[in-house]
Amino acid sequence: MHLLIPAAGSGRRFGADRNKLLLPLLGQPVLAWTLQAADQAQSITWIGIIGQPGDRADIEALVDQLQLATPVSWIQGGRERQESVFNGLRSLPSGAQQVLIHDGARCLATPTLFDRCSAALQTCPAFVAAVPVKDTIKQVAADGTIAATPDRSTLWAAQTPQGFTVESLLRCHRQGLEQQLAVTDDAALLEAFGLPVQIVEGEETNLKVTTPADLAIAELILKQRQFTAAIA
């Protein structure tokens, strides 16, 4: 399975002047945890890291340091995530038919999740890893008043990996760029053009590191995993 990792994370919310994926998390950069999990997954045979020129030297040095068994390629990103993924799709190895897209900031994804997602793509053409929403969600109007309370039983929180056939996702990205359609994840592109996308069970711990609080929570989860592994 081919895996694309968008890795152009801003450090703005951390008060940092560098990519948040290069910030330290329990002794190594955030991105290192993502790469190691993907490398340990039995199904992942190629990894493409999509980033910005200013981060290339640091990320390539990290890849060299990790000595991953899986081949890793650097791919030049675009101005926005959507354009970056499009560049990644066009840079896949010749003959690639299926692809997983995984945010580099979701550094707690496990090898088991990558393998489960790869297996799901063999039976459905497009999917999103997701978990059921636990909180009551309120739809709020522009003036701050509650407009609606959706039925929680129908709501899922989308994560990554998200999986697709290369042909369908590339076609939707081209159409999306032509129509200047802005989306927040790749599945939304397929949805916009009427293509079905299914849900695959994600992981509760598969959070996206966006704020300093997320980084602290991620460290606690990783410490717990290390403790559990040590006493097993």
Curated annotation (Swiss-Prot):
Lineage: superkingdom: Bacteria
Catalytic activity of the protein: 2-C-methyl-D-erythritol 4-phosphate + CTP + H(+) = 4-CDP-2-C-methyl-D-erythritol + diphosphate
Keyword set includes Transferase: yes
Protein's GO biological process: isopentenyl diphosphate biosynthetic process, methylerythritol 4-phosphate pathway
A molecular function (GO) term: 2-C-methyl-D-erythritol 4-phosphate cytidylyltransferase activity
Pathway noted in the entry: Isoprenoid biosynthesis; isopentenyl diphosphate biosynthesis via DXP pathway; isopentenyl diphosphate from 1-deoxy-D-xylulose 5-phosphate: step 2/6
Residue numbers marked as site, Transition state stabilizer: 13, 20
Site (Positions MEP for the nucleophilic attack) residue list: 152, 208
Alphabetical list of Gene3D superfamilies matching this protein: Spore Coat Polysaccharide Biosynthesis Protein SpsA, Chain A
Record keywords: Isoprene biosynthesis, Nucleotidyltransferase, Transferase
EC numbers on record: 2.7.7.60
Function: Catalyzes the formation of 4-diphosphocytidyl-2-C-methyl-D-erythritol from CTP and 2-C-methyl-D-erythritol 4-phosphate (MEP).
NCBIfam families for the chain: ispD
Family (UniProt): Belongs to the IspD/TarI cytidylyltransferase family. IspD subfamily.
Name this polypeptide is given: 2-C-methyl-D-erythritol 4-phosphate cytidylyltransferase
Species of the source: Synechococcus elongatus (strain ATCC 33912 / PCC 7942 / FACHB-805)
